Amino acid sequence: MAGHEVRYGKHRTRRSFSRIKEVLDLPNLIEIQTDSFQDFLDHGLKEVFEDVLPISNFTNTMELEFVGYEIREPKYTLEEARIHDASYSAPIFVTFRLINKETGEIKTQEVFFGDFPIMTEMGTFIINGGERIIVSQLVRSPGVYFNDKVDKNGKVGYGSTVIPNRGAWLELETDSKDIAYTRIDRTRKIPFTTLVRALGFSGDDEILDIFGDSDLVRNTIEKDIHKNPMDSRTDEALKEIYERLRPGEPKTAESSRSLLEARFFDPHRYDLAAVGRYKINKKLSVKTRLLNQTIAEPLVDAETGEILVEAGTVMTRSVIDSIAEQLDNGLNKITYIPNDSAVLTAPVDLQKFKVVAPTDPDRVVTIIGNANPSDKVRIVTPADILAEMSYFLNLAEGIGRVDDIDHLGNRRIRAVGELLANQVRLGLSRMERNVRERMSVQDNEVLTPQQIINIRPVTAAIKEFFGSSQLSQFMDQHNPLSELSHKRRLSALGPGGLTRDRAGYEVRDVHYTHYGRMCPIETPEGPNIGLINNLSSYGHLNKYGFIQTPYRKVDREAGVVTNEIVWLTADEEDEFIVAQANSKLNEKGGFAEPIVMGRHQGNNQEFPSDQVDYMDVSPKQVVAVATACIPFLENDDSNRALMGANMQRQAVPLIDPKAPYVGTGMEYQAAHDSGAAVIAQHDGKVTYADADKVEVRREDGSLDVYQIQKFRRSNSGTAYNQRTLVKVGDVVEKGDFIADGPSMENGEMALGQNPIVAYMTWEGYNFEDAVIMSERLVKDDVYTSVHLEEYESETRDTKLGPEEITREIPNVGEDALRNLDEMGIIRIGAEVKEGDILVGKVTPKGEKDLSAEERLLHAIFGDKSREVRDTSLRVPHGADGVVRDVKIFTRANGDELQSGVNMLVRVYIAQKRKIKVGDKMAGRHGNKGVVSRIVPVEDMPYLPDGTPVDIMLNPLGVPSRMNIGQVMELHLGMAARNLGIHIATPVFDGASSEDLWDTVREAGMDSDAKTILYDGRTGEPFDNRVSVGVMYMIKLHHMVDDKLHARSVGPYSMVTQQPLGGKAQFGGQRFGEMEVWALEAYGASNVLQEILTYKSDDVNGRLKAYEAITKGKPIPKPGVPESFRVLVKELQSLGLDMRVLDEDDNEVELRDLDEGEDDDVIHVDDLEKAREKAAQEAKAAFEAEGKE
């Protein structure tokens, strides 16, 4: 037997063909959401408050301090929040201290700070009753970036940018004349020496001393001349900068100083964030810049006087490692003192080294480091600016390297916690202005924190973020896999990110740093390709938001691959050589061969095994969860694999799903972590179990009660139904499955079914990827799914009185009311068809011009004679089903309703949808098609043992698409069916072709895995042997029931008077320009005329035509279409006197559109009137006959 047995949970064993020992289990797959939110509650929120507070008033006599905060119990439980359309949120109370500095009085008070949405255990938020997900955002990291650019003459120039988390950008660039310029916040450029002088280093010699002698520096100094001898060089530089930042305002050195200080050196206005400081220190550190340079002066330890490195030494990695501690502690530190008129007068510490120029051995180049400022410094310092300029000047000398902005070392993830913190910060800074004003205006003696704090800006910012941010998305809940994928999604779009139109090819492309961090396969097709990605299966965020991936450390000394796991970010990995997970190891755990395949930066090549630093932990660490669910992924073309991964997320949960015979072993973990199953929280023993709840007695005696969800409506209208797996007496451990969720079977993801599939053509019905299906799949409900739709009706107060929910509906027969209860609401369990009444409702009618008699009656009898019109909630077109549930909300019961609403009724209708012609089916390899014919079982081809085939696919769908994985799955699936086993073939480490053929032989199949098929209609065998096997097929969410649509009479657009378009508006089919040409070409003049008039926008014509049809009279001639009138009006507005004449040269009167219509859509009222008129005339004629 090939392969070995592996247990997945307590309910499933699979035969696995994996060969690679996995030393690390998959992490919890939704930790990117849950960990980030927990970190926000533990640290992020506190940091935001500490950033903005304390707040002082303008005279600095009062100060408001932050003490702490407490999050209390949520108002609603999860279930209540869902039912009441409320948010699952907890009140937050913040304690503030108000200090009066004049009197020394301190007032401490707790202030209610609004309700804060709380994340559920599943990593989602419930906002206004709907489940939402905050998608993590992929943004450019703050830090310093260097780039090169080639001008039109082929000359290479350089640029550099300091990008903060928030605040002004500082840019450097060279021009074609070899002069270096700087720009502050995207303004006009000035020579970079001007900024250096403004920082307090004003003399030319001083600048040359700091940066060393080079052409760039000399050229720039020559350009930057002293224009006004009255000013010092620093003051002149300050004024020049002020002129750039505030053109047209009177410039003084003092105002420039305060402006620059506010722009760069004020923590309230400028923030690098922890990650920005980390990136700047890393980039400007002398350690990386000295690597492989030849030192020009000996390096001496300042304390001991010991010579650490002799002049002329090449600074290799080992030399730098030997003096790393001294470098970190400020080796070669020089302190420069700025002059008194500088922006900041504090001394500036730099680390300064001299190295031999790589391009000219006789020249010396100066390298300046920023002397590693502390992590707490979140602003850019003068040392950073000078070190950045030094790096920039070094680039021209060939020292240092430019950055690749698509490298994942330069892009980071803003997960939910950080996005929320930014929103709270935004709200607090709006609140801050408000607080300052109130502190200054009101009487100091009686002020309390409660009085000066207005929480509205903060709650508004949070509400807006959850309700309408691009990153707050309605959860994709087609099935558990789509939920999981949505929680792990990384979007480059959104506020502060890219936009679709501006994103080029480079940003969207796969980068070598994506390996193990972002999936190269799973991304949408279409305009968002490459901008929306998915986290790889082992990906994990570090504290700075960079994605890490795990590797096994290689002990070079011992020549062994250890089981020690090291998590590396993309820029850390660049320094090492990493071997692939499938490198062969010997018994000792070392590499079996002297040469192994490995990666170093962007190169995949062979390396001597003694040079390798790390090894991949698993072959599936490259891909995301959905991609890792595709068996034989290694045999599929990547474009088709992309479709396969995306289509699994569109699978509809079936009534009786089955896990795949051929899986990848990922099905268990994906189902477990998706949040759709019920998982045991503690060890214990089951004491009670039914379909609705399970009780587990813990070892300490306490009782856990797990509620099982039955047929709840998911976000996408499918049935969210959980099924209990345990029975009384079972012992469960923490993490065990208590109940399967939708699309699960025995604790494994089960998106579809395992039908018997044959690759063969049949009467041409599977042309162009169409799918031919056996009627068995319809009769046995194999691909039947349940869909729940929610309809609601509310009663409001109108000007003419309140609307009413009632059984007494005007002009409706008793038959239509048979399923309504005494209130007028449909009973649960009733079968309804389109047009049936769900909730009977009447609205008072506007009483237009009552006659004197009516007014008298009205005065005598009150409301009895008042007119009402029927505004009942009816089943819309194309919908039918069984009423599953009715929920009634009223003010009287204490339900929170919108203002003006007295009662709200929600009706849930369940629909059982069998598979039918027009539904879309797919495999896991991007092989999708539409059901074209459902054939009776007796006519389907059958196997020699009499088993009929379930599905026939076209063999031509395979070769050109290059997704051969489906054929491998087909054969292995048949073997698994015959052997009665389930199989796991993990991606990139699955069944080889030998394993496949061994298993086929073991199952007693023919050596070519094909079989003779017999035609079900004649009993004759087909000419050739056919590939028949079991393939996992799923039914997708694109169902024909949602798309089928027909209209006879419906709404018309207000302006053009033409029918609306689209199924949602109950619109017509557009008969466009080209269709009109077709009718013209055939000379079908009468058809053409009615298409352009009655059926479109001839308002009077269509009324008369309707009347003629109802009375059985000949249809009158059409009039002038409304669009023609619009054209005439347009020409008249251009001053052309245009009139319409008939064949006798008489002018045709064009009616104006009715004034006073304020509705965008004219409904079928005109036709209703025509119907009423016809009915009245018929009644009158009948009465007249009676009299005669």
UniProtKB/Swiss-Prot annotation:
<dbReference type="Pfam" id="PF04561">
    <property type="entry name" value="RNA_pol_Rpb2_2"/>
</dbReference>
<keyword id="KW-0240">DNA-directed RNA polymerase</keyword>
<keyword id="KW-0808">Transferase</keyword>
<dbReference type="InterPro" id="IPR007641">
    <property type="entry name" value="RNA_pol_Rpb2_7"/>
</dbReference>
<dbReference type="Pfam" id="PF04565">
    <property type="entry name" value="RNA_pol_Rpb2_3"/>
</dbReference>
<dbReference type="GO" id="GO:0000428">
    <property type="term" value="C:DNA-directed RNA polymerase complex"/>
</dbReference>
<dbReference type="InterPro" id="IPR007642">
    <property type="entry name" value="RNA_pol_Rpb2_2"/>
</dbReference>
<dbReference type="InterPro" id="IPR007120">
    <property type="entry name" value="DNA-dir_RNAP_su2_dom"/>
</dbReference>
<dbReference type="InterPro" id="IPR037034">
    <property type="entry name" value="RNA_pol_Rpb2_2_sf"/>
</dbReference>
<dbReference type="InterPro" id="IPR037033">
    <property type="entry name" value="DNA-dir_RNAP_su2_hyb_sf"/>
</dbReference>
<dbReference type="InterPro" id="IPR007121">
    <property type="entry name" value="RNA_pol_bsu_CS"/>
</dbReference>
<dbReference type="Pfam" id="PF04563">
    <property type="entry name" value="RNA_pol_Rpb2_1"/>
</dbReference>
<dbReference type="InterPro" id="IPR010243">
    <property type="entry name" value="RNA_pol_bsu_bac"/>
</dbReference>
<dbReference type="InterPro" id="IPR015712">
    <property type="entry name" value="DNA-dir_RNA_pol_su2"/>
</dbReference>
<dbReference type="InterPro" id="IPR007645">
    <property type="entry name" value="RNA_pol_Rpb2_3"/>
</dbReference>
<dbReference type="GO" id="GO:0003899">
    <property type="term" value="F:DNA-directed RNA polymerase activity"/>
</dbReference>
<dbReference type="Pfam" id="PF04560">
    <property type="entry name" value="RNA_pol_Rpb2_7"/>
</dbReference>
<dbReference type="GO" id="GO:0003677">
    <property type="term" value="F:DNA binding"/>
</dbReference>
<comment type="subunit">
    <text>The RNAP catalytic core consists of 2 alpha, 1 beta, 1 beta' and 1 omega subunit. When a sigma factor is associated with the core the holoenzyme is formed, which can initiate transcription.</text>
</comment>
<dbReference type="InterPro" id="IPR007644">
    <property type="entry name" value="RNA_pol_bsu_protrusion"/>
</dbReference>
<keyword id="KW-0548">Nucleotidyltransferase</keyword>
<dbReference type="InterPro" id="IPR019462">
    <property type="entry name" value="DNA-dir_RNA_pol_bsu_external_1"/>
</dbReference>
<dbReference type="Pfam" id="PF10385">
    <property type="entry name" value="RNA_pol_Rpb2_45"/>
</dbReference>
<dbReference type="InterPro" id="IPR014724">
    <property type="entry name" value="RNA_pol_RPB2_OB-fold"/>
</dbReference>
<comment type="function">
    <text>DNA-dependent RNA polymerase catalyzes the transcription of DNA into RNA using the four ribonucleoside triphosphates as substrates.</text>
</comment>
<dbReference type="Pfam" id="PF00562">
    <property type="entry name" value="RNA_pol_Rpb2_6"/>
</dbReference>
<protein>
    <recommendedName>
        <fullName>DNA-directed RNA polymerase subunit beta</fullName>
        <ecNumber>2.7.7.6</ecNumber>
    </recommendedName>
</protein>
<dbReference type="GO" id="GO:0032549">
    <property type="term" value="F:ribonucleoside binding"/>
</dbReference>
<keyword id="KW-0804">Transcription</keyword>
<comment type="similarity">
    <text>Belongs to the RNA polymerase beta chain family.</text>
</comment>
<dbReference type="GO" id="GO:0006351">
    <property type="term" value="P:DNA-templated transcription"/>
</dbReference>
